[in-house]
Amino acid sequence: MLINEGRLEIIGGAWSMNDEACTHYHSLVDQFTWGFRRLNDTFGSCARPRIGWQIDPFGHSREQASLFAQMGFDGMLFGRIDYQDKEKRLNNKMMEFIWKSSPNLGKKRADLFTTAMFNTYSPPPGFCFDILCNDEPMIDDPDSPDYNIDRRIDDFLRYAVTQASHYRTKHIILTMGGDFTYQHAEMYFMNLDKLIRTTSLVELFLAYAQIQARAYKTNHIILTMGDDFHYQQADMVFGNLDKLIKYTNQRNGSVVNVIYSTPLCYLKALNDLNLQWPTKSDDFFPYASDPHSYWTGYFSSRPTVKYFEREGNNMLQASKQLVVLTNLKNYDKSLEHFREAMGVMQHHDAVSGTEKQFVANDYSRILYESMDHAGEIISKAIGKWSGMESSTAASFKIFTCLQLNISSCAFSEKSDTFMAVVYNPLSRPVSTYIRVPVQGNSYVVRSLTDGVYPTVQIVPIPEGVQKIPGRKSNATNEVVFRASDIPPLGMLAYAIAKKIQENVVEQPQSASFISNELYNISVNTNGDLTVHWNKQNMNVVQSFHYYIGAEGNNENFINRSSGAYIFRPKELSARNFAYSGSYKIYKGPVVQELHHTINDWVSQVVRIYSEEQHIEFDWLVGPIPVKDKIGKEIVTRYSSNLQTDKTFYTDSNGREMLKRVRNYRPTWNLELMEPISGNYYPVTSKITLKDEKKQLKLNILVDRAQGGSSLEDGDVELMLHRRLLKDDAFGVGEALNETAFGEGLVVRGTHYLFGGKVKNTDTFVLKEKELALKKCDFGMFSLTSGLNKALPPNVHILTLEPWKDDTILLRLEHLFEVGEGQRMSQPVEVNIQNLFSTFSIESIKETTLGANQLLSENKPMKWEPEMNDIIQNEEESRQTVGIHDNVINVLLKPMEIRTFILTVKRTSL
């Protein structure tokens, strides 16, 4: 009833309020879609969220705003903004603006009205009525010696007026909560009721409102009246609020009118004024709360959690696809739990690495259980689809190996003969290299599809990996072979058998380098790795370094410690490692490897595969020693001879690229007291350098979210691991000191280097995107294709999952940005009617990105930019998709995602 009457509004609507730096757009779309679905199933269509509510994340991404716009939202409100940015916006009434979130999608599809709130999401000073606060309650009994209504209302009015002065309308929003507030919600609301009734408490309140109003463009301001963990005694809080509203509105001569409201009502009041608004086209990273507190540490905190989340998404997508393609029944609950586990992982204190250790452990446990159950789904689906389940023994089962990141798989290690099934979740054929941990020294591999014996190479598992604490594997080698032309949404199966011959493992060679026609890779006298491009004037030196984390008492800015949130190096440069290691080289027909040891706890394997154009850096860091009582933050640096003029590029949540310029912000004059951490940005998928004169490009792709920068021209720096001994006092309450099996945590990960001269941009960028997508392959154990035909190389099936009432949710996306390629950046049309091999489409409905509203019914508020804004040429609205003469054509423009709900007719497997 409350929702249907508009008295209770659902905002945000995702499974959690996600982080915006370390999350991938694929997981963001998923967790909003599932949250919307549960809201609709529970409350009906009136509960459909229309407002983005990102009040606590530590910086805001442009892609997040773009996704909100594509979900049909009317606007977005957030709480945290860089202190210098906020000062300028307050002084210029620019706290509210139109965020132009995608130059590719344009105004109609990606512009989003955005409000930066005055006091994050907390109440005005002196007006927190929660049991966690000590602010004076509202006492309106005139016979009480503690009567304070007149004074308290004066205070409140001053605050409201101050806030309103910074905004462009007469509407402001006052937040009235905070961390851990509302534990006694009745008490909190009792005081809020009094505040609203009584506003000298009233004059204070009015003064605050006037202060806030000066920062905003209209005469509407929003006053938030809560905080974390507030409203635990709601009656007390609302009792005070009722008084505050009552006495404020009764005040003679007051220009402030206070009402209970919602974010949507607030935006509606602004929209009704038909004003023009300033615009913004970049993002809000990095976020600093003071001159020495740059919230860039969490870009890299808890790197194993970040990797595990990415692996979880890969497995979830494979599970959903296989359930759809095989029409598998009775697994709704398992998928539901998996979706929800992944939704929790997107939280701004989950994948960010800013939770306590025991909470991180619990998140990982929940995700592991979901992935383990997903293994059963995958096994059942593959068995059904391939026919192996019915044609083999009842004990048929496919095992998923969740410890391949430490080169461990119990099934392959203990079996002399086994089958490996490789599933391709992409929309076109791919070839990839498979690595299977084994104990033996000689193996043969045969394709079960065409009987071909691919070339096999046996390489040793690096010594550092074999010594990882807690690794119980007996595998000492890996079988490496190329799985060629795995069909789109399809599988290939390989039989792997141990041979009698022994001693065929690749042995270290006396060569001092590895090379192919593109690269020559060696180790220099300093122990750094050098990469030389054979046919181009391009060189890279790759090295490892560490920062000493600052330690202080956190009582003032200058004494801030480096911690889970904050990256603050003690010194102005990273320290070099003393090279005490060595290297070994292994060459074979499939892969060449350089095993490079820096010291006892830093090493890597550098690989070039026979038919690939990238270089793979498989790094291993830890346990980071802290017996010297010094916290350390480990980075790798790729130093090139490119001339980059302070400029580099990073992705936004794995999607569009943003230009970054060292020591610069596009919208204010930056004063930088922390030149290292203040130049760090989130790297979800890729960081890029360009030499415009030479037309050379260097890309580093990552396998998890990391913090990165270009601190010198031609350099890329990425943070791999952090171990710190002091908390930064921003909420975790413990140092970021991860341990496992009684030692410091060991982290293993991969970077993919791809670069060279850009001649044919289509070919260059397509190779790069294929590499990024192949990192999503879930290497499991399989013989058919879910597609009758491959999609064009610039089109990807983002979502294929079972939906409601036997329908299917399908998303198609265009992978290229405008101007990123030549032919590949053009609009592309695909016919999806006979695309899928296991079903045909009987009806199709297009929805907003969140799949909770028909696209034709979505009519978001329209907002006008200021006259000095550059108006983009708007193309015609997207074509309606339907079935015409047994054809379903879908037109995709650059960076466009289109979402459909399908009813289908199944075909026999």
PLM region descriptions:
Residues M342, A497-N524, D528-V531, N537, ...:
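Terminal connector regions
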Residues E96, S442, Q509-A511, D528, ...:
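Short, acidic/polar N-cap/turn motifs at the starts of alpha helices
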Residues N477-Q501, W863-L909:
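C-terminal beta-strand-rich structural cap/linker in extracellular carbohydrate-active enzymes
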Residues M1-M419, P425, T432, N441, ...:
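Catalytic-domain carbohydrate-binding cleft regions of carbohydrate-active enzymes
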Residues F58, D82, K498, G850, ...:
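Flexible, active-site-proximal loop/turn residues at the rims of small-molecule/cofactor binding pockets
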Residues I434-G451, T455-V465, R471-N474, R823-H884:
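Carbohydrate-interacting/catalytic domains
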